[in-house]
Swiss-Prot record:
Keyword annotations from UniProtKB, A to Z: NAD, Oxidoreductase, Phosphoprotein, Tricarboxylic acid cycle
Binding site for NAD(+): G12, A13, G14, F15, T16, G17, D36, N100, L123, T124, N125
EC annotation from Swiss-Prot or TrEMBL: 1.1.1.37
Species of origin: Bacillus anthracis
GO-annotated molecular function: L-lactate dehydrogenase activity; L-malate dehydrogenase (NAD+) activity
Protein name: Malate dehydrogenase
Catalytic activity of the protein: (S)-malate + NAD(+) = oxaloacetate + NADH + H(+)
Residues noted as binding substrate in the record, renumbered to the chain: R87, R93, N125, R156
Broad EC category: oxidoreductase
Length: 312
């Protein structure tokens, strides 16, 4: 009996896509297909070959190919979308909507054609709106179209808390809700260091500064790079989500999910805690929010809906 190997296709062979592909292969989670536009087919093949040639050194067994032909992605278990125009310094996420939504629709049609049973994970910004666009175009069940932002935003939040307390990031837990933008909602009340509430360890003004830095985390890196945006942490976040799906781990992770009444919102994709497993989003977890937390989430939802108004 032949055992079918897992297959993940990564759409977009830029910094984030290529890093994601390499991390997936390193962890031996699946065979990887790295896809980009025909004009970039040779560089995409070159990156894939370069990764493959690292396998004897890194000690992993996974096949990696580069292509511009979506037929090569057929029967993927998971498809990760990182393609889209890059965010530039001073550029708002809203500016990305019109162009990237057109790109999403084109990509999604190819995914649906060749991998109708896949789970799609979207990274392209503005990710809440782009995930909604992919969902509408694909016609897949809502649990199989997921956006990635909460894992990344929470990772940034945890990093800054660990730095503040001079503790291991492994001992920091937390959640960031809402849209992936300046109105995201880091939930201090649900965040802990070794099980101890942060509010007992960090002064209020320092916590407020950490929350604000988390909200501006992506922009901080964009400004420092001068060209392009973050890719190591986004790629690592995509891999964590993909692993939870492929291994049916049923991880509790923040992810962008389609809401139908949860938290009082409907017909939009928003970052919320979910159980992530082999079927995609197995369950949306509704946290009890205080009045000020709900007001902050309302503002975040308003920002997401404003971006969605310009979807094409």
């Amino acid at each position: 009996m032949t055992i079918k190997r897992k297959k993940v296709s990564v759409i977009g062979a830029g910094f984030t896509g290529a890093t994601t592909a390499f991390l997936l292969a390193q962890k031996e989670l699946a065979d990887v297909v790295l896809v980009d536009i025909p004009q970039l087919e040779n560089p995409t093949k070159g990156k894939a070959l370069d990764m493959l040639e690292a396998s004897p050194v890194q000690g992993f067994d996974a096949n990696i190919i580069g292509t511009s032909d979506y037929a090569d992605t057929a029967d993927s278990d998971v498809v990760v979308i990182t393609a889209g125009i890059a965010r530039k310094p001073g550029m708002s996420r809203d500016d990305l909507v019109a162009t990237n939504s057109k790109i999403m629709k084109s990509i999604t049609r190819d995914i649906a054609k060749h991998s109708p049973n896949a789970i799609i994970v979207v990274l392209t910004n503005p990710v809440d709106a782009m995930t909604y666009s992919v969902f509408k175009e694909a016609g897949f069940p809502k649990e199989r179209v997921i956006g990635q932002s909460g894992v990344l935003d929470t990772a940034r939040f945890r990093t800054f808390i660990a730095q503040e307390l001079n503790l291991s990031v492994k001992d920091i837990t937390g959640f960031v809700l809402g849209g992936h933008g300046d109105d995201m909602v880091p939930l201090v009340r649900y965040s802990y260091a070794g099980g101890i509430p942060l509010e007992t360890l960090i002064p209020k003004e320092r916590l407020e500064a950490i929350v604000e830095r988390t909200r501006k985390g992506g922009g901080e890196i964009v400004g420092l790079l001068g060209n392009g945006s973050a890719y190591y942490a986004p790629a690592a976040s995509l891999v964590e989500m993909t692993e939870a799906i492929l291994k049916d781990q049923r991880r509790v992770l923040p992810a962008i999910a389609y809401l139908e009444g949860e938290y009082g919102y409907s017909d939009l994709y928003l970052g919320v805690p979910v159980i992530l497993g082999g079927n995609g989003i197995e369950k949306i977890i509704e946290l009890e929010l205080l009045a000020d937390e709900k007001e902050a989430l309302d503002r975040s939802v308003e920002s997401v809906r404003n971006v969605m108004k310009v979807l094409v």
